[in-house]
A protein has these predicted regions:
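Conserved Nudix-box catalytic region and its N-terminal flanking loop in Nudix hydrolases
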Residues: 19-59
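Short alpha-helical functional segments enriched in proximate histidine and acidic residues
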Residues: 60-64
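Active-site-adjacent beta-strand/loop module that shapes the phosphate/pyrophosphate-binding cleft
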Residues: 72-107, 124-129
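Short acidic, Gly/Pro-enriched loop/turn segments at secondary-structure junctions
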Residues: 107-120
Length: 129
């Protein structure tokens, strides 16, 4: 299903969970005290949620997403979550937004200090495994 963002829809966001073997990519936003997040961000007016995800991932971590699987959304904040297993490129951080990244095991990722949005998406992912 394709959702198109229109004027007034300011809280919609797309977040991607990059998976490599049993690892997941988490990122630390620039200026965040200790919280980690997952790549992604706000969807612009006129973009589909997938287009927003592709753009945000390329901007934040320099990875060109090739294929995604839609996982679901958080009803309260309109955050859409995707599983990403195919991409091109190497990680290149946009330091204005992301200051560092880590590949962490899926079975320990919830032990990290995560944003609420990241925690909800990762928990949704773990519930499907």
């Amino acid at each position: 299903m394709k959702y198109e963002i229109k004027d007034g829809d300011t809280s919609w966001a797309a977040k991607g969970m990059f998976l490599k073997d049993d690892l997941i990519l988490i990122v630390k936003p620039t200026g965040s005290k200790h919280r980690y997040d997952i790549p992604g961000g706000k969807i612009k007016i006129g973009e589909s949620k997938e287009q927003g995800l592709y753009r945000e991932c390329l901007e934040e971590v320099g990875l060109k997403v090739k294929k995604v699987k839609y996982l679901g959304k958080n009803e309260e904040r309109e955050k859409h979550y995707f599983i990403i297993k195919q991409w091109d490129g190497e990680i290149v951080l946009q330091l204005e937004e992301i200051e560092k990244y880590r590949w962490v095991p899926l079975d320990t990722v919830l032990q990290y200090y995560l944003t609420k949005t990241a925690h909800q998406g990762i928990q949704m992912l773990l519930d499907t495994i």
